Amino acid sequence: MVGTTATDVAPTMGVKIFSAGVAACLADVITFPLDTAKVRLQIQGECQTTSGIRYKGVLGTITTLAKTEGPLKLYSGLPAGLQRQISFASLRIGLYDTVQEFWGGEEATPSLRSKICAGLTTGGVAVFIGQPTEVVKVRLQAQSHLHGLKPRYTGTYNAYRIIATTESLSTLWKGTTPNLLRNIIINCTELVTYDLMKGALVRNDILADDVPCHLLSALIAGFCTTLLSSPVDVVKTRFINSPQGQYTSVPSCAMSMLTKEGPTAFFKGFAPSFLRLASWNVIMFVCFEKLKRELMKSRQTVDCAT
């Protein structure tokens, strides 16, 4: 995934991890309202509703949330979201090239097998580390203040404390199984598709290794990822947000959705998921590639000066 020109120096692992974390946080800040809309649409239809309001479409959900609960509600859970990107995206994206080289061994050109293995490895490790931030983020996004409903949590750190003390510390890792499956799918599809598309565009002289190439590759990766991960993503959101006892397991959550709402329930929130992931990918990958190069140029300048 590292693109270098003749004058570029390959970025170090530290530069890649730092660049991935910063780029992911920037992408999260810009696209977070879409993520909140996605969560609200995904939990809509459960027998236990949060507010009685029906959300319709991406813009309709965002508009309804802003009007009924205030514009700031669109960013509820953002601190946990940024914590998630620092602990999660920085590892799954920043370590991808290094792990790919490990799996590739003596390969002159990384094979599809080594790319997939790298995506599986970095995605799996990142989920276990970042899962508590995901649980808090989803719960803050899902809770409503309407109709006299008392919010479960007043803020990010309050949510961590209440979940750990009233439910158990292990609840912070609730939904790890569907989230692990989701992020293995996302990581493999997103990074491998981006890597393959970018390589094909550059190798066939269709586009240079620059912003237009990164943008197109990120858009294609975003669509493929959303299509494959949507069913698991909806189950993950429902299970994480559910109160104790509503579902006995991840499969029971999936079966409940299937029997009560039908197979289309697994694609609830597809539009905001795609808009969010595609725009997130574009912002993140373009910034990631640019930041890596600028940091290495700055490092070269400092090295030359000394």
Curated annotation (Swiss-Prot):
Mitochondrial matrix-facing ranges: 33-73, 133-177, 232-265
Reaction it catalyzes: H(+)(in) = H(+)(out)
GO biological process assignments: adaptive thermogenesis; cellular response to fatty acid; cellular response to hormone stimulus; cellular response to reactive oxygen species; mitochondrial transmembrane transport; proton transmembrane transport; regulation of reactive oxygen species biosynthetic process; response to nutrient levels
Topology of the protein relative to the lipid bilayer: Multi-pass membrane protein
Repeat region (Solcar), residues: 11-102, 110-200, 209-294
Protein modification: May undergo sulfenylation upon cold exposure. May increase the sensitivity of UCP1 thermogenic function to the activation by noradrenaline probably through structural effects.
A GO cellular component annotation in the UniProt record: mitochondrial inner membrane
Residues at which fatty acid 16:0 binds: 56, 268
Mitochondrial intermembrane membrane side: 1-10, 97-115, 195-211, 289-306
Keyword Mitochondrion included in the entry's annotation: yes
GO molecular function term, any single one: cardiolipin binding
Sequence positions bearing Cysteine sulfenic acid (-SOH): 253
Record function comment: Mitochondrial protein responsible for thermogenic respiration, a specialized capacity of brown adipose tissue and beige fat that participates in non-shivering adaptive thermogenesis to temperature and diet variations and more generally to the regulation of energy balance. Functions as a long-chain fatty acid/LCFA and proton symporter, simultaneously transporting one LCFA and one proton through the inner mitochondrial membrane. However, LCFAs remaining associated with the transporter via their hydrophobic tails, it results in an apparent transport of protons activated by LCFAs.
Record protein name field: Mitochondrial brown fat uncoupling protein 1
Taxonomic source organism: Ochotona dauurica
